[in-house]
Amino acid sequence: MINDKIKVKDLAIELGVSTKDLLRVLRELEISAKSTISNISIEDLPKIRAQFNTPNTNKEEERRQIQPGVILRRKRQQPSTNQTDIKLNPVDTNVSESTIQTENLILENKNTLSPHIEETTEKIPATTNEILYNSQIAKIVQYPTPSVPNKTLTTTPHQTKKNHSEKDVLESHDSSNKNIKQSSSQNTEKTNRKPAASAIPEGSSAPSLLPPVSEQIRRLHDEETENSSSEEKNVDIQQKEIPSTQVRVISKPNITQSHSWDANNTRSSSGQRTETEKQSNTAPHTDSREHTGHNKRPVSYQGQNRNNFIATPDTIPNVEHDGQNKKKRHTSRRSTEFNHKFQYNNEDDDISRQNRGRKRHKQKTTSQVTTQPIKLTKRKIRVEEAIRVADMAHQMGLKANEIIKVLFNLGVMATINMSLDIDTATLVAAEFGYEVEKIGFTEEDYLVATAPEQSESLKRRPPVVTIMGHVDHGKTSLLDAIRKTNVTGGEAGGITQHIGAYHVTTKSGEIVFLDTPGHEAFTTMRARGAQVTDIVVLVVAADDGVMEQTREAVNHARAANVPIMVAVNKMDKPEANPDRVLRELSDIGLVPEDWGGDTIVTKVSAKSLDGIDELLELLALQTDILELKANPDKPARGHIVEAKLDKGRGPIATVLIQEGTLHQGDTFVCGVFSGRVRAMFNDQGKKVKDAGPSMPIEVQGFEGVPEAGEAFICLPDEKLARRIAESRAIKQREKELAKESRVTLETFLSKTSNEKEAQVLNLVVKSDVQGSLEAILEALRKLSTAKVRINIIHGGSGAITESDILLASASDAIVIGFNVRPTAKVKEVAEQENVDIRFYDIIYKLVEEIKSAMAGLLAPISREVYLGQADVREIFNVPKIGTIAGSHVSDGKVLRNAGVRLLREGVVVYTGGIASLRRFKEDVREVQKGYECGISLENFNDIKLGDVIESFETVEEAASL
């Protein structure tokens, strides 16, 4: 099992992520992991790896506004790309406004904007050409692909090429507008990336990477500038007077490519600056131009470094922090987020620069807000069958003492390691506004039959008939008469103490009989037999009539909704009175057919075999009416009728198959145990290879002794069966711990007071089969009283072992063996450890002796017996002896060795003994009524006339339960 799991911390090292991120993903996937040392199943690894294998290509820059107009920039590592290097050439002074956009933002004051431009490895003059931007946000343009012909514009400080004229711009104006809109609509999602940035102090050199700008957008802008107002033309003239700067290669982008913030990534994957970036260290200067129009231009390029792009809050796209490192987000600098106010809209890419700049107020855009409203999710905690207080506090983000305080208010004494069941956890979580969600492995998905049975696949099966009734009414004898065997002769005391399952072939067909015990201690066995049966045959003795267990059997059959047939047995006895039996049956609701009812009643005699054939015919008729069918071609399902631990073969269980066919080698799950069928035996002890519906078989191959009555289900996968069994064992353990640890103040106080007074009888019980053990434990628990409490230290099926003796020795217990015997070595260990072993084969003898042992634990009861009294009529003071009371015995007698009380006006003045009792001068042992005597009391002389001396004695009696 160890190889099937992996620890959280080992998986985190393997995936290269932090344990905190891994635990977060596990919670999202609803995989139970409470700490870094928790184990994760190998089956869950693929979906965990799928969460971390998705490459994060959105490592971009994050923008924050520290002060009005001041931007915080941080860098994150970006994957290296195979894109071609960008060549920079000198630019002519006549170059008009460009729509170059960048992803790098620097920390700059709004009033003193000082952009920089990166320098290439070639020597570039330090002159700049001032460029104004009308765009609201930075446009992202990717590299062109070979499918689109590139038109390169290269300008030098002293010459300008004429191939980019106004005519070229006009020709490409219409097509470029369409292409830009199409490209923008295709890449709306990709442009809304999360930029990442690294903080750079104000005034320092800011290395920047300028993405290439498409030629068609530049031509559009040239056309706009020619049609603009005279104020714009004056600005262009002012631009030409300034020395030229350098511009990147401008080419037409591929229409199908997306505008990505990290399209032009020239940094290495390690995040180090390149030599080209390090060379950019030009001093900034401010813009001396006046801005006119209704709206001031939000973005401008100033100074000799064009790559330093200053964005006002209007131009900042949405910045999300979901993927950011917490340590990077919370810097020591004061930062203000403005992404909730200024939102980046991808549809602005479809609008011309004219509508984004000075004339933006003239055209209203119907842009939609890209951010979605945050949905309020209910706060939930995940609980399986139970949860510890510490784990619950961890999930709720509280301290454990807060939960303990709530539990104290609910009357529950709690500790930090106490397990809470799901009901208590729900109450506590509601106090803090949380909901409890029950999670865990759901076995119902694999065990519950989903598809209904097809009528063609159903075949007839033998009926399961359970014989029930009062003890000694002849149930097993009747079954022996049907089977022509002698089971009764082999039973201790002639009573049945196990459930017997037998397959019988009769003239009327095959019938499966279940013989249940009739003793009152085997109530659970009878209830279990009624649940798995088709017909109940109620056996009533003709001489005894309806008894207590007869009524109980009727109630079990009615609760299981099973038809009842009555067999009046012992008709051969001369004192048989069947009419009285029928009358008593009518009183409990079983009206015979002869009396106008619907209960089938037949008169039989197991001893003389009278009425047996008639009973079998009635059973066959009832079977035809019920139309019992089952599908033999599906995996087997059934119930455990009886289970035991065999010394040579291990755990063995009697299974009654209800549907399907059980084959040798099948994998099954039963209760908290799983296993594989190693061998199967029928009711006659013969080995069989398979068993169909309604067949009782003995199955060998359990991992442990299952509980009688558990469901037996075959599964196709052994691993699944083991997992279901482990899940059930964990749930059962959590339920037991939660039940034991749930102590209220009332139960705690009552328990402590009872423990001081009550005696405890510790027992270790071993039985031959699981069903008998269940009955014995239930009968012993009923014997507990307020004075003596029975404590079952251990109960199990199988032979008495040395470990049982050592356990009994450590806990001062008595070992009870029911139908089991110890070996010579075990007896020797018991003698050494002074452990008492008691053996029984009849359950009521066991119960009687345990009662006697319980009574022996009680201390004897002291009882006071009144003997008589004497009236004081004279007082004599004798030197050296004291006061002597001359008394007359008015009632009963006064004994010399008895105790006495001195009563004065009805008040007890003295209680003690008699020092001397004399009649005349002789010492006497007793004085009868009507005689006079002299009485002196021990150590007491204050006797007065008129006092009454009462005589009594104390008698000890054995305590009773």
Curated annotation (Swiss-Prot):
Renumbered residue ranges of the record's region G5: 605-607
Gene responsible for this protein: infB
Family: Belongs to the TRAFAC class translation factor GTPase superfamily. Classic translation factor GTPase family. IF-2 subfamily.
Bias (Polar residues) ranges: 146-158, 241-285, 301-310
Biological function: One of the essential components for the initiation of protein synthesis. Protects formylmethionyl-tRNA from spontaneous hydrolysis and promotes its binding to the 30S ribosomal subunits. Also involved in the hydrolysis of GTP during the formation of the 70S ribosomal complex.
Region G3: start-end pairs: 515-518
A Gene Ontology cellular-component term: cytosol
Gene3D superfamilies in UniProt: 1.10.10.2480, P-loop containing nucleotide triphosphate hydrolases (3.40.50.300), Translation factors (2.40.30.10), Translation initiation factor IF- 2, domain 3 (3.40.50.10050)
Protein name: Translation initiation factor IF-2
One example GO MF annotation: GTP binding
UniProt keyword terms in alphabetical order: Cytoplasm, GTP-binding, Initiation factor, Nucleotide-binding, Protein biosynthesis
Cytoplasm as UniProt keyword: yes
tr-type G domain residues: 460-627
PANTHER family: TR-TYPE G DOMAIN-CONTAINING PROTEIN (PTHR43381:SF5), TRANSLATION INITIATION FACTOR IF-2-RELATED (PTHR43381)
Stretches for region G2: 494-498
Stretches for region Disordered: 146-373
